[in-house]
Amino acid sequence: MGLRSCTHFATLVIPLWALAFCFLVVVPVPAQTNLQTSKGDRRLQDLESNMGAESDQPNANLVRPSLSRFGDKRNQKIITFGRRVPRPMIPIELDLLMDNDDENTKAKRFDDYGHMRFGKRGGDDQFDDYGHMRFGR
């Protein structure tokens, strides 16, 4: 009779765990996306009202892009388990971050004689005319 009570207990507990999972995980996700879309709508309305206020100025004849095409993708409902990662508006060029000045550093560090330089000519740190330390003096 012990085995029968365990199976009866398991049949009662498993649906309760599934119900708790639904309330804790599945229900908050659409609520979060609805909150994000309402914030996006509010920002869009603020931008459109600012654009309407600026249209009274003399620069009203300039053609401005419609905000509706930018807002369409942002207001789509996407069900995910995490927050959206903000992406920068301007892409970062990785080539600019890399330092590829090997030729310049070699030219600065060594003089024509292959000796390591400690300073430029005419500076206060100058050791002699060639820019390298002479160990004989």
Curated annotation (Swiss-Prot):
Keyword Signal: yes
Signal peptide: 1-31
Residue numbers carrying Sulfotyrosine: Y113, Y130
Propeptide: 32-74, 85-107
Modified residues (Phenylalanine amide): F81, F118, F135
Pfam families, A to Z: Sulfakinin
Compartment(s): Secreted
GO biological process: adult feeding behavior; adult locomotory behavior; inter-male aggressive behavior; larval locomotory behavior; multicellular organismal response to stress; neuromuscular junction development; neuropeptide signaling pathway; positive regulation of cytosolic calcium ion concentration
Molecular function terms, GO-annotated: neuropeptide hormone activity; neuropeptide receptor binding
Keywords: Amidation, Cleavage on pair of basic residues, Hormone, Neuropeptide, Secreted, Signal, Sulfation
Family membership noted in the UniProt record: Belongs to the gastrin/cholecystokinin family.
Protein's UniProt name: Drosulfakinins
